[in-house]
Amino acid sequence: MAAVDSEAVHIQEILKDLIRSESPSGGEGTADDANSMVGKVHAAAAPHGTKVTSQAVGPNSENVIEVLEGVGSRAFVIEAHTDAVPPGGRRRWADGDPYSAAEGWVEYLGGDRVAVEVGSHRFEAGIRPRMSKIWEKHRTQRRRRILYGRGSFDNKGCVASALLAMGALARACKDLDVKLGGTVVAAYTVDEEESGSGIKRFACTPDSWLGTHGFLSGPRDREGMLTDVSAVALDGSYGWVPIVGHRGAVQLAVTTRGRAAHAATPELGVNAVTAMARIIVALTDGAEEVEERVGKALNPALLGPMTMAVGTTIAGGGVRAVHMDGAPSVERAGINAIPDWCEATIDIRFPQGPRYPSDVRETKDAVVAAVREYIEGTVDRGGWSYEIRELNSVPPVALAPSFEAAAALPLVHQERRRAGQVLGFEPDLETAPGGTDATFMIHQARIPTIVELGPAGGLSHDVHEFVEVDGVIEGGKILALLAIDRLGLAE
């Protein structure tokens, strides 16, 4: 599409500016703050000739909503979140700057390894096997241009692709004096990395943006899914490969309670930290047995097996605070005391159940029950107690029972066809290891949604994060063409 190619250089400059903006969850900014992530997205969309508004979510956190109005009640939603996780230790990044937006290269080394080159720096790192498959099957060149920095891949490259697509669609409709047979809505949402408050405010209730604009009240199929609205959830991915499902997640906090005593007389106390260590070791060593206890409540055929990450955070005793400026710095007291409390977290990912989607709560409850039962049956407790509480949960998402069935869905079929035209190969279908905002769009808004879609890159939530520049531009073309396929032209 010529309208995309003509903006290729400009969108790269916009993307650099977005990467330079810190945008923590809940602190993405507001449209009237030109230096914030939200302010920059709003300003980038404003010249398109679309209708651009903001939607308050938190005190310093707004969704940006861009609308290209067409004819009729149908809608196609392009959703991309604007927040990014913290950078961690800044000294580990090239030149100590996680927000440099520096230009560079990624080189595929084979064996799930890449080298990231930025200036005089070269870093080697692992990538997901799904991304290695793209390099191995479809790429002859082993080096690709990148932009470097926290949030580049997850998720500012996606935001740039959406901006590029919306601008191209608006320009093409104006130049050709045509209208689409429905409305394209680009939702640049906040807080995906934490609670999902942005997507909920935009899509999930009658008083959400979609609800108040009438898009949630249209016809539905026999499973309750809307038939006049469809969507894609943009998130750092594998180069416009349609993701058709992801596992559910449940995050647990385990608290152990012991008895305090002076460290000089440890026999008079019960150490809650060593008690927690017993639980962590038991669950780590027994992960397969925990999954077996869940048994028939899981159907891993599409989304893969259950996994447990035990001890994702831990604190206890006299720990008061942890400061993360460079190397971690722990503020503590009571080093000379036996700790009477300890808390650790567990992140569990699990596939759908045999009666999905009607059994999503039952499946999650079976997973939590299996963890409790395993601790009760394997960890010897003497003088200490524990409790488990659920912090957060997200249901699994599966667009269909199998890859074959998902490939036959019109939304997925059209995306693969358009990606094939732009990329030179028709991508396979994949599932994602983690969650996206599509969870809420599918389970709450009941909108058919490609679960994850986006440009290639790597190392999200890690140091040396990068996004491939050409993939951002290719995405603008794919999204614009897909919007035309979904809505058609007005007669």
Q: Where in this protein do the model-derived segments appear?
A:
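Metal-dependent amide/peptide-bond hydrolase catalytic core
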Residues: 1-8, 23, 27, 36, ...
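Acidic/His- and Gly-rich active-site-bordering loop/insert found
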Residues: 1-152, 171-180
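A structural signal for isolated positions on well-ordered beta-strands in alpha/beta enzyme cores
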Residues: 53, 77, 185-187, 387
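Short acidic loop-to-helix transition motifs that present clustered carboxylates
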Residues: 58-63, 195, 238-239, 434-437
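Short glycine-aspartate micro-motif
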Residues: 75-77, 147, 227-233, 251-253, ...
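Short, glycine/charged-enriched secondary-structure capping and boundary segments
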Residues: 91-95, 163, 200-203, 246-248, ...
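Intrinsically disordered, low-complexity Ser/Thr- and acidic-rich flexible linkers and loops
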Residues: 108-128, 211-223, 320-333, 357-361
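Acidic/histidine-rich catalytic neighborhood of metal-dependent amide-processing enzymes
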Residues: 139-245, 491
